[in-house]
Amino acid sequence: MKITKEQLKAIMPNIEGNIKKNKHFAGMTLDEVTELLNKYAEEFGITTPRRWAHYLAQIAHESMEFRYTEEIASGAKYDTGALAVRLGNTPAKDGDGQKYKGRGLIQLTGKYNYAEYKKYCGFDVVKQTELLAKPIGAIRSSMWFWRKKNLNYYADIDALLTITKLSNGGTNGYSERKKYHDRAERVLV
């Protein structure tokens, strides 16, 4: 199943304007973004209306409808302590948290996750972290994460809360994710 730009606009009413505001998507159009989403979706098994609905709900919330593909916060909270270590960053105050803050449509966070994605994609996103915020990197890394966490399975059984926890590490923004999901279900199913 392929999605259309009309469906994306019905699910994320601000997507077109937000793409223009996203500094990493400079010059991109909604047509081009739609084409990229469709280009990579099959590779990652996002091929049914239900899977698309769940995937789009998560990325709509995480990116504020494509407005941001880089975490707004500085990333300092990932720089020291147990959280830094869990994410593969060094526990020293050396800037790893800021360097490996969340990027992509689903905010890939931490040196460990960047290194794992690098193994898959072949681009050195550990050294060139900004690649994860640019269109291809933002889209592919979110779909890679989706497959890595087996989120298609949870989409198939309509487990929005579980998908949210696995995408976000908690239930942050659950009501908004549900709103996007319900809208996507109406549009796609």
Predicted regions and their residues:
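Surface-exposed patches in mature extracellular/periplasmic domains of secreted proteins
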Residues: 45-55, 68-72, 152-163
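Extracellular low-complexity, O-glycosylation-prone Ser/Thr/Pro/Gly-rich "stalks"
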Residues: 172-189
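Acidic helix/loop microenvironments that form the catalytic cleft of cell-wall polysaccharide enzymes
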Residues: 59-62, 155-173
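Peptidoglycan-targeting cell-wall enzymes and recognition modules
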Residues: 2-32, 36, 55-145
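Short, mixed-charge amphipathic alpha-helical segments
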Residues: 42-47, 127-133, 155
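Non-transmembrane alpha-helical segments in soluble domains
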Residues: 38, 56, 143, 164, ...
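Proteins synthesized as precursors that undergo proteolytic processing into mature forms
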Residues: 137-139, 148-155
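Amphipathic, Lys/Arg- and hydrophobic-enriched alpha-helical face
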Residues: 36-42
